Each structure stands twice: as C-alpha cells, then as structure tokens.
C-alpha cells in the first residue's frame, strides 16, 4: 500500500524528474541526508534502477576523522492532493470475475490521495563541496570493498527528501462486483491516502496503515565517481555517470552473470539512466505497425524455449502461479528483486516480506528448479538446476513488474484466451498495421467484449488498437518508448507456458 501511494505521488509531482519513491514504510527512517545509498544498475532496458540504503554516511567513509556537518535547507514542497477518476462501461465475464468495460451500463471509480502539507529538506551543495574539498574516500573500508566487488552498483549520497508534516492514513479498499450468471466477483484494490482529522475510520476499509508526521515518502540522490586514489566527484549532470574508476580499467567488465550473455534486451553496462542517453526514447518508432517488433520477437521465441520444453504439469503449475501473481503487485516486485539478485550473484533478502509471502516466493523458485539450502530470509545458497529456465523466468517477471498498473487487464487477457491471437499480430500485420478479421489467427478478437479488454491493455502500453467491420489496425502511439516491447515480452512468456491452460 505504502509503495503504491508513494509511487503515485512521484508520478504526479515529479514525472521524469529525480525523485525516487520510498518503497517501504520501515525504510523511511533510513532516509537520512548525506547517507550512503547504493544504486544497482539496470538488468533490462525497461527496468528502473534499484536503490539500497546503507547504515553509514559520507563522513564515515572519508579518510580523515573530521565529521561533515551539512547545512540543511528546508522549504515547503507542496500540499499534495491527487484525484484519480476512471469511468468504465459495460461488462465482460472472465473466470475470475466480471470486468466493467465497453458499451452498455456504466461504472465509476474515484481515488483521492492526500499527504497534506509536505516539506522538502535538502543539503546545501555549494557548502558541502567546500567542506569536502581535498578530502578522499577510504577505499579499503570493508563496506566499500563489498560494493566494489559486486561491480554492478554505484555509490550515491542522499541529497534531498520529501517528508510529511502531519499524520496520514493509507486505506486499502476492495471493491467487488456482484455475482452475475454464476461468475464470482472481480476484486480491485483501490489505494486512498488522506490526512487524519480525527480518529474515525472508514467502515468498508480492509487494511489501514497510519503514516506518522516526518515520514519520508520520496528522496533524491547524487551519484559519486570514485577514483583509484580515493578522490571523488559528484555527478551533477545527466551525462555524467557514477561508479568506480577500477571498472573502466578492467575493460568494462560485464556486471551480469553468465546466464544472460546473449540477452538482446540487456541494458548496456556503461549506459546512463537518463532516457536521452539510454536510447529508450527512440527504441520503437512512433505511428509504426506492430511488425516493427518482429525481429525482437523472433529472439523472444528462443529465450522462452525452456518454458515450451517443460513437462505439461510443470508448465501448468508455472502458468497458474504467474496468473495468480498478476493480482498481487507487491509479490511481483519482490519476485523480480529476488531473481535480479540471483542472476547477478547477490544474496536475496526476503526480510521485508511476511512468512506467507516468503513461503510463496520460495515455492515459486523451487518450480524453477532453484533449490534453496537455508532459512527463507538468509538465502545463502541457491542451486539452479536449469539456468536457461531461470533466465526465461527472470525476463518474464521483469516485464510483468513493469506493467504493474495494468496487471488486471493482462490477467483478463490470459483468462479470455486471447494471448495466442495477440502474439500473432506482429507477424501478420501489414506495413500500416492492418490485419484482416477473416484470418483465423485473430478470430478470438472479433468478439467486442474481448476486443475492448485488449484495446485498453494495448493503450496502457502505448499501442493504439482499432477495429472496423473487416479489419484490425494496431500502431504505436507517439514516442512509445519501450512499452510495446515490454507488453510483448509478457505476452510471449505466457504463450510459451501454454496460453490456453485452464
């Protein structure tokens, strides 16, 4: 709940900016100005960097024993009140519920969010740069040696944070449609954040989380570039990249494990995160037919072959488990983090999860043949019996995680058995994106209810889908970035696992 609320806040107030949402309430106390933060480089081109708070500050790793006392500048940030409305019409039934879409009947959903008056605390950079002049970092410290050895992390300092000034509550409501034609209702979680005026609570709330004053909900960092000598500099410009000088001397060693050496969508180890330089903005052209994805999708077929080769019972188990995960966004994120760690040689950490979530995650890893040899929260050893299978699962879960805002629609497409038809579109679409409805490959999409679900899913991934009496037309929207590709990674993954499994 907390992660969803902070993510929405950053998206609404600083989209494309430098703010990073705090993902866990218990991590808020770790958001300390001048504290050290590690940034794990991206694995796939669509992933966002992962950040981890260390227990030390910049002062603690400098060679001299003279502590830095940063000048903190505090100011009003905003009074944040967000209102999200979603008008939906009509309905279509799936195996897990009725989804309101299309024509005939109306629905309305409103989500109000308020963190109240927010304050911004930031370090006076000019003064800080004077304070650290001619000072060096102790590269022999045990902590920094661990960061250097991992090779895929960048050291940062925390330069700013956004904090609440009054108590707030986050309330998770579950809206359920009535049973229709014997089909169970479809639940959708709605996250609401509001400032507490008194002790009263909503009666229909299923989960309530209280946020105390002075809670950090977002923060910003500055990457450090650290030289052999221990001298360091702040990376203040977009084109500057943090890291350790040692990396470049070692020949730009690939930070990723051998599992993924041939992965076409891997993020270049020396690329920076700003989309102007990563090429994400121009990855897929605007107003283009889905046929532009054909080359990448041919590689996907190879990458997902381990799914195809699985015995039918194991295929079905993986497919059903992943379909269930689509209704639990937090578990998708946790699973992606663990697979990232395994595939980069790090030790997974499940301490943020409750025991049930830990068990579910371990059960999923065992489906992949990843045998764990210790307690859930201390996964010291893992023995992947099939590295190619682990690679395929990592690719699919990473794509699903990026589609977090539309996971219910993706689940609906799985249940409506339209995934095979969607996977055919790039291969049979003409140069202008047209596909004739007479093709048996797209017969499942001729139903108006199914089409409306697919249209909304495609729109969320920057694909415009239209249907006439005789044809479908699917083209990318303006500056689609990597989103059409990510959607098709997810679709191909489910298709390879048996898109029609019941």
What are the roles of these predicted feature ranges?
Residues 90-94, 182-186:
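Residues on the lipid-exposed face of transmembrane beta-strands in outer-membrane beta-barrel proteins
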Residues 2-83, 102-179, 194-299:
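Membrane pore-forming effector domains from diverse proteins
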Residues 215, 222, 228, 236, ...:
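Long, helix-rich, hydrophobic modules that act as membrane-proximal anchors or helical bundle/coiled-coil regulators
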């Amino acid at each position: 709940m907390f992660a969803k609320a902070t993510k929405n806040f950053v998206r609404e107030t600083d989209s494309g900016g430098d703010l990073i949402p705090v993902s866990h309430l218990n991590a808020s106390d770790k958001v300390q100005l001048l504290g050290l933060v590690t940034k794990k480089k991206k694995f796939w081109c669509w992933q966002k960097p992962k950040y981890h708070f260390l227990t030390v500050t910049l002062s603690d790793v400098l060679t001299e024993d003279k502590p830095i006392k940063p000048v903190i500048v505090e100011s009003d940030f905003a009074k944040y009140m967000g209102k999200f409305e979603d008008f939906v019409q009509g309905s279509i039934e799936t195996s897990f519920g009725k989804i309101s879409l299309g024509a005939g009947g109306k629905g309305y959903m409103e989500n109000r969010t308020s963190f109240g008056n927010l304050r911004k605390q930031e370090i006076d950079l000019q003064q800080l740069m004077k304070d650290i002049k001619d000072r060096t970092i102790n590269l022999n410290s045990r902590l920094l040696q661990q960061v250097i050895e991992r090779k895929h992390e960048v050291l940062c300092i925390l330069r700013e944070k956004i904090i609440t000034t009054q108590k707030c509550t986050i309330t998770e409501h579950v809206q359920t449609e009535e049973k229709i034609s014997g089909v169970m209702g479809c639940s959708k979680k709605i996250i609401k954040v509001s400032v507490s005026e008194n002790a009263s609570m909503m009666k229909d709330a299923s989960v309530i989380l209280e946020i105390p004053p002075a809670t950090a909900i977002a923060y910003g960092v500055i990457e450090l570039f650290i030289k052999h000598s221990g001298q360091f500099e702040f990376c203040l410009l977009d084109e500057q990249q943090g890291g350790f000088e040692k990396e470049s001397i070692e020949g730009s060693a690939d930070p990723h494990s051998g599992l993924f050496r041939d992965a076409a969508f891997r993020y270049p180890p020396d690329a920076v995160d700003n989309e102007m330089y990563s090429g994400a903005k121009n990855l897929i052209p605007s107003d283009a037919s889905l046929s532009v994805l054909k080359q990448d999708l041919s590689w996907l077929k190879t990458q997902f072959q381990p799914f195809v080769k699985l015995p039918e019972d194991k295929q079905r188990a993986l497919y059903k488990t992943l379909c269930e995960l689509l209704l639990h966004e937090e578990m998708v994120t946790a699973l992606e983090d663990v697979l990232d760690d395994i595939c980069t040689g790090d030790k997974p950490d499940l301490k943020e999860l409750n025991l049930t979530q830990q068990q579910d995650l371990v059960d999923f890893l065992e489906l992949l043949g990843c045998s764990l040899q210790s307690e859930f929260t201390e996964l010291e050893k893992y023995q992947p019996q099939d590295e190619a299978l682990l690679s395929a699962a990592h690719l699919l879960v990473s794509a699903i995680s990026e589609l977090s805002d539309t996971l219910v629609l993706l689940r609906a497409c799985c249940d409506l058995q339209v995934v095979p038809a969607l996977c055919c579109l790039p291969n049979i679409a003409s140069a202008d994106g047209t596909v004739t409805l007479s093709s048996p490959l797209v017969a499942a999409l001729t139903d108006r209810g199914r089409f409306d679900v697919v249209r909304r899913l495609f729109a969320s991934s920057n694909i415009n889908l239209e249907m006439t009496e005789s044809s479908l037309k699917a083209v990318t929207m303006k500056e689609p970035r990597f989103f059409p590709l990510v959607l098709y990674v997810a679709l191909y993954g489910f298709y390879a696992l048996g898109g029609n499994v019941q």
